[in-house]
Regions:
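N-terminal intrinsically disordered, acidic low-complexity segments at the extreme N-terminus
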Residues: 1-19
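N-terminal Sec-pathway targeting helices
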Residues: 24-37
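Hydrophobic membrane-insertion alpha-helices, especially the h-region
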Residues: 34-47
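Hydrophobic single-pass membrane-insertion segments
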Residues: 46-59
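Aromatic (tryptophan-biased) beta-strands that constitute blades/sheets of beta-rich domains
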Residues: 60-138, 148, 153, 158-166, ...
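Repeat-blade elements of multi-bladed beta-propeller folds
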Residues: 96-109, 133-165, 179-205, 218-247, ...
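Hydrophobic/aromatic beta-strand positions that recur at structurally equivalent sites within the blades
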Residues: 168, 207, 249, 288-289, ...
Length: 503
């Protein structure tokens, strides 16, 4: 269900009966003047056209809104007068940031996940390389012509030779270097030529992005799950660990700058708008600090139907406009989508998501982050086969699109590429949804070596907790400026996707 766009019109209410086209009451005494008036008007226009009009004025060309005589109140309410795309469709496809590299989880330090790049219409696998298991935190980065990814090795939670960080050529998949670790590597961040990595062995590494050599390493003594937040201009790195400790390092040398504490493990990592930093602890504790670590505000986020008892936070927050968007999970389903928006300035609650579109009755636990595009937030809904869009200002559901098989879990966060939402799902496939038409425009299967959908994919119960055939995708995709999409699979392959027409 899609809400209708409200239009303001200068035409007034519909014409009532007994009124003619001139808006006059249907009286005989007045009707006799109508035909002569039309004749006079026609003669006047003819005289202007042939005798008085400026013959040097431009003929043809593009008529802009500044040139048009149509009143701007005919535009959808709130539409920008100079946005032709918005005028035609009523939908904004704009990103709030300009990205040239995918240097962080969901592209940037705000985690909005939106980039302007060529879109794929006929997907193909450009290359496929075994790197080791790509879990929920093993989402790649793309900087220039290089792809960086952390690996959980051949078996998660155990020591093996595949644990570490890899660098690949974006176009060929050729390995450029490998940096080994003792246990699973988790999240990555990039800034000033340095890859920052976290891992299960409780260390934070600064690695030279050019050759994979170690620049610095610091030991926290407890697993670091989340994605490092790298503020490049400030040479600042912020990481969270399993004890809920937030630690800031100097990007260049790993020097300790400050530490803070939140309630519960920090699983998804921190987020920033470049001035403030927001960290969410698993036990609903959300802390905002400045770049010196000084506390700005701290709040406990409570979901409506849990009274704070069971709700937890796993995913990294998203900062967009004046909002900090938090997703949540619990042991049971939610009555409404499990998403809350806080005011960036003070942490007060702005909205909690509501399903006014009537999409479903039981909403699942969300372990992924949202992406932001135009006036929408988009994400993959668990306990479903749906991509869901919310109004960014109200948190109300706007629309949904079927994407693949019905699965209970959902881990990957989406990316938005020039109006296409790219989302991988637990069923092992990746999907593209056109925002303007609200339709799925392509899909591609990543859960096996052949790259073909299993024969039983469309059967009832194919996915549920795990696909009956093939492997899931838990990691989130990265998008290059040339339109390539890169993501890792639970089978252990890193896959680059392009368009067949690109050659």
């Amino acid at each position: 269900m899609v809400r209708r766009t409200e239009y303001a019109s200068f035409l007034g209410p519909p014409r009532r009966r007994n009124r003619d086209f001139a808006g006059l009451e249907n009286r005989v005494a007045l009707r006799v003047f109508v035909l002569p008036a039309l004749v006079v008007g026609f003669v006047a226009i003819s005289v202007w056209w042939f005798a008085l009009r400026d013959d040097n004025s431009a003929v043809g060309g593009v008529l802009t809104l500044e040139d048009a005589t149509i009143p701007t109140v005919l535009l959808p309410s709130g539409a920008a007068a100079d946005d032709a795309g918005l005028l035609l469709s009523g939908v904004s496809l704009d990103c709030e940031e300009e990205l040239t590299n995918w240097t962080s989880f969901q592209g940037s330090i705000t985690h909005q996940g939106c980039i302007k790049a060529p879109t794929i219409s006929n997907p193909t696998i450009e290359w496929r390389i075994f790197t080791g298991i790509a879990g929920w935190l093993n989402s790649p980065l793309i900087v220039g012509d290089r792809v960086f990814v952390a690996s959980a090795g051949r078996a998660q939670g155990t020591e093996d030779a595949r644990d570490g960080v890899y660098a690949y050529n974006l176009y060929t998949g050729r390995q450029e270097w490998f940096f080994g670790a003792t246990l699973d590597m988790n999240g990555l961040g990039y800034g000033n030529g340095i890859i920052v990595a976290t891992g299960d062995e409780g260390r934070v590494w600064g690695i030279d992005a050019t050759d994979g050599s170690l620049i610095w390493v610091e030991t926290l003594g407890v697993a670091t799950f989340g994605y490092p937040l790298v503020l490049e201009e400030d040479n600042l790195v912020v990481v969270g660990d399993a004890d809920g400790v937030v630690t800031a390092y100097n990007l260049r040398n790993g020097g300790l700058l400050w530490q803070r504490q939140v309630d519960g493990p920090i699983r998804g990592g921190a987020v920033s708008d470049g001035e403030m930093i927001v960290i969410a602890g698993e036990n609903r504790d959300v802390l905002a600090v400045d770049k010196n670590g000084t506390e700005l505000w701290r709040v406990e986020v409570r979901e409506r139907d849990t009274e704070g008892a069971l709700a937890r936070i796993w995913a990294a927050p998203t900062i967009v406009r004046d909002l900090v968007v938090i997703t949540m999970l619990r042991e049971d389903t939610f009555a409404e989508p499990a998403i809350t928006a806080l005011r960036k300035s003070d942490g007060s609650q702005v909205w909690q998501a509501m399903d006014i579109a009537g999409i479903k009755n039981e909403w699942g636990s969300i372990r992924s982050s949202v992406a932001a595009v135009g006036d929408l937030l988009v994400y993959g809904e668990p306990y479903s086969d749906r991509l869901v869009a919310l109004d960014i200002e109200t948190g109300e559901t706007a629309w949904d699109v079927k994407t693949g098989a019905y699965c209970f879990p959902h881990w990957p966060s989406p990316a938005v590429v020039s109006g296409q939402v790219i989302i991988a799902r637990h069923d092992g496939a990746m999907y593209a949804v056109d925002i303007e038409t609200q339709t799925k425009v392509w899909d591609i299967y990543l859960g096996n070596a052949a790259g073909t959908f299993p024969a039983d994919f469309d059967t009832a119960g194919f996915c549920e907790w795990a696909p009956q055939t093939g492997y899931s995708v838990l990691a989130s995709p990265a998008v290059a400026a040339n339109g390539y999409i890169v993501v890792g699979t639970l089978e252990g392959y890193l896959v680059a996707i392009s368009d067949r027409s690109w050659g």
